[in-house]
Every structure is written in structure tokens, then in C-alpha cells.
Amino acid sequence: MALARVVSFEGVSKERMEELAREMREGDRPEDVPATEVVMLHDPEAEKSVVILFFETEDDYRRGDEVLSAMPADDTPGRRTSVTKYDVPIRMTP
């Protein structure tokens, strides 16, 4: 079963989110993070963000979690407020 790493952030400005989105589109993703998909959600009025990373195996999740947990604060969207691991029993696209 796939796993998801769901991270919440505060203090995420619209400008910071635009900068991160541009970096991700240009291929500037964290190395050694074997995520199969990344979803970034942003509430610009509340300056909050949620980042969801999907992993296919427990080993991939562990590797990604180690790298992302060690990431400098300047490389994250804002102040990290929570990190939660979820099983992904259903994942659908149209």
C-alpha cells in the first residue's frame, strides 16, 4: 500500500509559494526523495500550506522522510507545524 507524508506549514506567503512552484517546475526537487507524486496546497489569505508526498514503499517513505526532515528551513515553504504519515488505501484520477 502506498504511503503519504503530509506536512503543514504556517507563514507561507503567496510570493514564497510562487517561488517554490517555479523551482519545482524547473526540476529543482530535493534529491534522494523517492516520492512518486507531490501535491502542494496553499491558502494565501491564512498564509498556510499543506504538502503531500506519495511513496510506494515503506523504505521509500523512510528515505524521503529522513531527507525532508533534515532540510534547512530556507528550503521549506514556511514554518513546519506538523508532519503526519498516512496509508493511502485509495488514489484515483479521472
Stretch-by-stretch model annotation:
Residues 1-50, 56-70, 76-94:
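Short S/T/G/P-rich N-terminal loop/turn motif that feeds into the first structured element of a domain
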